[in-house]
Amino acid sequence: FLPLLAGLAANFFPKIFCKITRKC
């Protein structure tokens, strides 16, 4: 469960960060 959550976060957070800061 934990590795899956870490993998999901690794995909999710960069996209959110990209939208907020507009630095991709």
Swiss-Prot record:
Matching InterPro entries:
Antimicrobial_frog_1
Instruction: Please state the protein's primary subcellular location.
Output: secreted
Q: Which GO terms describe its biological process?
A: defense response to bacterium; killing of cells of another organism
**Listed Pfam families:** Antimicrobial_1 (PF08018)
* Tissues expressing this chain: Expressed by the skin glands.
Q: Which family does it belong to?
A: Belongs to the frog skin active peptide (FSAP) family. Brevinin subfamily.
What is the organism of origin for this protein?
Pelophylax ridibundus
GO CC annotations on file: extracellular region
Q: List the disulfide bonds.
A: C18-C24
Protein name (Swiss-Prot/TrEMBL): Brevinin-1Ecb
What keywords are annotated for this sequence in UniProt? Amphibian defense peptide, Antibiotic, Antimicrobial, Cytolysis, Disulfide bond, Hemolysis, Secreted
Task: Identify the domain of life.
Answer: Eukaryota
Described function: Shows antibacterial activity against representative Gram-negative and Gram-positive bacterial species, and hemolytic activity.
Subcellular location(s): the record lists: Secreted
